[in-house]
UniProtKB/Swiss-Prot annotation:
Subunit structure: Tetramer of two alpha and two beta subunits.
Subcellular location: Cytoplasm
Organism of derivation: Magnetococcus marinus (strain ATCC BAA-1437 / JCM 17883 / MC-1)
InterPro entries according to UniProt: DALR_anticod-bd, Gly-tRNA-synth_bsu, Gly-tRNA-synth_heterodimer
Coiled-coil ranges from the UniProt annotation: none
PROSITE patterns per UniProt: AA_TRNA_LIGASE_II_GLYAB
GO MF terms, alphabetically ordered: arginine-tRNA ligase activity; ATP binding; glycine-tRNA ligase activity
Alphabetical GO biological process terms: arginyl-tRNA aminoacylation; glycyl-tRNA aminoacylation
Enzyme class at the top of the EC tree: ligase
UniProt key word Aminoacyl-tRNA synthetase: yes
Enzyme Commission number, as recorded: 6.1.1.14
Annotated family: Belongs to the class-II aminoacyl-tRNA synthetase family.
Gene designation per UniProt: glyS
Reactions mediated catalytically: tRNA(Gly) + glycine + ATP = glycyl-tRNA(Gly) + AMP + diphosphate
UniProt-recorded name of the protein: Glycine--tRNA ligase beta subunit
């Protein structure tokens, strides 16, 4: 068994790309080795901003030998009557690179055929590895690549060196132009001791440690966590958990060192979200908090090196932050000179989407739709929701949001004039209306905020679908998937909103009257509803719910997602019922029979005529259905779907008996029609909850 180590030394790889590149390099190497038939025990991948590394442990010395049996023509076609080889036999032998007399004969169920076993000896690892390295190098999934120097090769950043060692011996490979191929590796750009020759992974690790490089990202993250907490504690503060920022700093540094900085206390008069946004998102600093969660005039920054006098570095970091905070203080003062409500006309000059008008028009639509939603769930908040919708986008034309786009909505909440107590409700709704911004993002806590958020997202979805703007593959420039998932989460959160989505989508469509959407109302609304169910299916699948359960509910054409999910949850429990498989099979059979009926004289909406019931099995089924029908409908109308399915489960025996003993398609029209109406009644009861015929029974 051998050890293979491969490092690509580069200029600084962007932090957002590094974790994925480390993972991809390991996976691509593993796949390439498997495809090449070169066995191994383990593939390990590591990386820092200036290097990507793969180590293959327990690598086999050579590929496995391959035997391939080639089958030629049938024996009777391979030789003529005199026993001489035909052109077919000669051609087959020539293709195998041998004479005809070297071919074998193989017996098959179809007769005797000529054959040849081609034996191919496996290549040594040193022969195979260069091709694997080239394959992996080209396949790394970078969002963007570049050329460097005068070469034509492309990579995310210029490649400086390549070190490839198989049991201490360099592997000759050509990956790109103007690259050093060497067994010497470099440590930290500033603290390293120059290039060091390595023989294996153990000596490589030692060279990295001596050269002030923490090779493993998890080690860098642990160092960052400990350093941040220690520095914050030194001034009596704490730091909020932020694994994303920890990981980003780990991808920015090779030797992370936590340093404590401070800023002038006068900046604490600025809203805390402005300060934390500037520190976290713009400078990658960790804000320091007091015990109550308020900001202290301190921050922790992660440097990429140690110096004899760290205060020099700290002053530099403080100077950069001060410039940011000076800008923020200026915008905070200037923006408040104009009332937020007075900025509404300015939105007329801001295009929201080329085909869908300005932000002013969107605000008008949002106000109307928010009022319509509130009228259904909280009439007392209709006026507040309308006001929040109308002014929700006004902060987009402020200086602060222009400088810090992440603060959209938040600054609107601060800038809204407080003329009465209810304005606090409006301000909070404006702050929350972009929520949730992603799959794991927090949801609005206020009812008014949820209403305005729904109005915003529904307006976006209906407008885009109405103009034929829909997600395709991986492209979703207007975030429609995110918007749909946001609507789903808003409706399904703990205190869900029972809303008729179809009616709301129709209302949203009509608000585009002056613009004129390209698609018709029915087509647009149906497209949006289908899109919701597609995202709902993905959302529930992520929670472990089988796709067929959603299909069974979607078939009912419901537009209340809270109700739809309640039905799905009942089906999840129903799957555990002993009668589940039999009842699913029965529903499929009933649906199949009824779908094939072509009889213009048959009206399935008529009730069952007890006088026409002849067989005891159909009489028993009709009686059992009559006994549970009212209870099933009552349970269903009150959202007690599990109880409704429990009542229906009791029908298993009589349904089985019916199909065992009764011929549905009787020659007598009256009898046949009555039996079909009985099946339609049974199927209709199940469809009070879901289309059970859509469910799937796992094969045993």
């Amino acid at each position: 068994m051998a050890e293979f180590m491969w490092e690509i030394g580069t200029e600084e790889i962007p932090a957002r790309m590094l974790p994925g590149a480390i993972t991809a390099m390991g996976e691509l190497t593993r796949t390439a080795l498997q495809e090449a038939g070169l066995g191994f025990a383990q593939v390990e991948s590591q990386g820092t901003p200036r290097r990507l590394l793969v180590v293959v442990h327990g690598l086999h010395d050579k590929q496995a030998d391959v035997q391939e049996e080639r089958r030629g023509p049938a024996l009777q076609a391979a030789f003529d009557s005199d026993g001489n080889p035909t052109k077919a036999a000669q051609g087959f032998a020539r293709g195998c690179g041998v004479d005809v007399d070297q071919l074998s004969r193989v017996e098959t169920p179809k007769g005797t055929y000529l054959s040849y076993t081609l034996k191919q000896a496996g290549k040594g690892a040193s022969e195979v590895l260069p091709g694997i390295m080239q394959q992996v190098f080209k396949a790394l999934p970078w969002p963007k690549t570049m050329r460097w120097s005068d070469g034509e090769s492309r990579f995310v950043r210029p490649v400086q060196s390549v070190t490839a060692l198989l049991n201490g011996q360099q592997v000759a490979v050509e990956l790109a132009e103007n690259v050093r191929y060497t067994d010497a590796v470099s440590g930290h750009r500033f603290m390293g001791k120059g290039a060091v020759v390595v023989q294996d992974y153990a000596s490589y690790q030692q060279a990295m440690a001596d050269g002030k490089v923490m090779l493993k990202s998890e080690d860098r993250m642990a160092t960052i966590r400990a350093g941040v907490l220690a520095q914050a504690a030194s001034v009596g503060g704490v730091v909020a958990s932020d694994e994303g920022l920890v990981a980003e700093n780990a991808s920015l540094t090779e030797w992370p060192v936590a340093l404590l900085g401070r800023f002038d206390e006068r900046y604490l008069e600025i809203p805390p979200e402005v300060l934390t946004t500037s520190m976290r998102y713009h400078q990658k600093y960790f804000p320091v908090l007091d015990a109550q969660g308020g900001l202290k005039p301190h921050f922790v920054v992660i440097a990429n090196m140690e110096t004899e006098d760290q205060t020099v570095l700290v002053r530099g970091y403080q100077r950069v932050l001060k410039a940011r905070l000076e800008d923020a203080a200026f915008f905070w003062a200037e923006d408040r000179k104009i009332r937020l409500t007075d900025r509404l006309p300015d939105l007329q000059a801001v295009v929201w989407q080329a085909k869908l008008g300005s932000l002013f028009q969107k605000s008008q639509r949002m106000a109307h739709l928010a009022s319509a939603i509130a009228a259904r769930v909280a009439p007392q908040q209709a006026a507040l929701a309308e006001k929040a919708g109308l002014y929700s986008k006004c902060d987009l034309v402020t200086g602060m949001v222009g400088e810090f786009p992440e603060l959209q909505g938040i600054m609107g909440g601060y800038y809204l004039p407080r003329e009465r107590a209810q304005d606090e409700v409006v301000a909070l709704a404006i702050r929350e209306h972009y929520m949730p911004a992603g799959a794991g993002d927090a949801l609005p806590q206020s009812l008014c905020g949820r209403i305005v958020s729904l109005a915003d997202k529904l307006d976006t979805l209906v407008g885009c679908f109405g103009m034929g703007i829909t997600p395709t593959g991986t492209k979703d420039p207007f975030g429609l998937r995110r918007a749909a998932l946001g609507v789903i989460r808003l409706l399904l959160q703990e205190q869900g909103l029972r809303l008729p989505l179809r009616q709301l989508c129709e209302e949203a469509y009509r608000q585009y009257g002056e613009i004129g959407l390209e698609m018709g109302e029915a087509q647009t609304v149906q497209g949006v509803l289908a899109f919701f169910y597609g995202r709902l299916q993905a959302h529930l699948k992520a929670e472990g719910v089988d796709y067929d359960l959603i299909d069974a509910v979607q078939g009912l054409n419901l537009d209340d997602l809270w109700d739809a999910v309640s039905r799905v949850k009942a089906l999840v429990a129903f799957k555990q019922d002993a009668a589940y498989e039999a009842l699913v099979a029965a529903n499929k059979r009933m649906a199949n029979i009824l779908s094939k009926v072509e009889d213009s004289a048959l009206d399935l909406t008529l009730g069952v005529d007890e006088a026409v019931l002849k067989a005891s099995a159909e009489q028993g089924l009709a009686a059992a259905v009559a006994a549970v029908e009212d209870r099933v409908k009552t349970h269903s109308s009150n959202g007690r779907y599990a109880e409704a399915l429990g009542e229906l489960a009791a029908l298993r025996g009589v349904i089985d008996t019916f199909f065992d003993e009764v011929m549905v398609m009787d020659e007598d029209d009256a009898v046949r029609h009555n039996r079909l109406r009985l099946l339609a009644t049974v199927l209709g009861l199940f469809r009070q909850v879901a289309d059970v015929s859509c469910l799937v029974v796992a094969e045993k």
